[in-house]
Amino acid sequence: PFFMGPPETAVAFPGFTGPRPPILVIGGSTGALRVNQAIHANLDALLEKFNVIHLCGKGKLEKEYDGRPGYVQFEYIGAELPDLFALADLVISRAGANAICELLALKKANILIPLSKNASRGDQILNARSFEKSGYSKVIEEEDLTNEVLLSTVNEVYENRDKYIAAMNKDQEKDSISMITDLFETVIAEDKAKKAK
């Protein structure tokens, strides 16, 4: 197996072999059932091209997928999470503030699947739209998340990952927090303008 990190905290990735690039899937602190279902439904197709590191959320592990070469699942990763971000060539994530700041800081090509308005205050949708507008991310709305959409989007973003990284690098001299704040203000202003029409 492939091991990552110092010996005392090394994380094992059984069956991970090159040259398949790693995808990191983060469902959120409590897991994201729809995201997990879509990953599992597409797992055979994903593993033809990628290794998959899947953070499923507490109580969301599916034992039937244990031991699949190129796939490893965890309920949660703590201190090693930055290492997983660094390892991944592509990240699939919810669009919480912590996650998007990490993606921007590490310049990681990513797909954001924000919590729907039915399940949140809508802040993740705002985060995701802001990042997509700046060319940092590709967004799949939860209502649009089908097996086909996920697989085609993964392939599209991976093949064009340099474009997303270049967009982040273009703005690297600007402070990340102020840049995100500016993005939010722009999107909010556009929303208000649309509603005023």
Provide a role label for each language-model segment:
Residues 9, 13-91, 125-128, 140-148:
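Donor-nucleotide binding loops and adjacent catalytic segments primarily
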Residues 86-101, 108-109:
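Acidic donor-binding loop of glycosyltransferase active sites
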Residues 93, 109-121:
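Short hydrophobic beta-strand element within catalytic cores of glycosyltransferases
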Residues 136-162:
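C-terminal "capping" alpha-helix adjacent to the active site of nucleotide-linked donor transferases
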Residues 162-174:
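A short, well-ordered alpha-helix in the C-terminal region of glycosyltransferases
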Residues 173-197:
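C-terminal alpha-helical cap of glycosyltransferases
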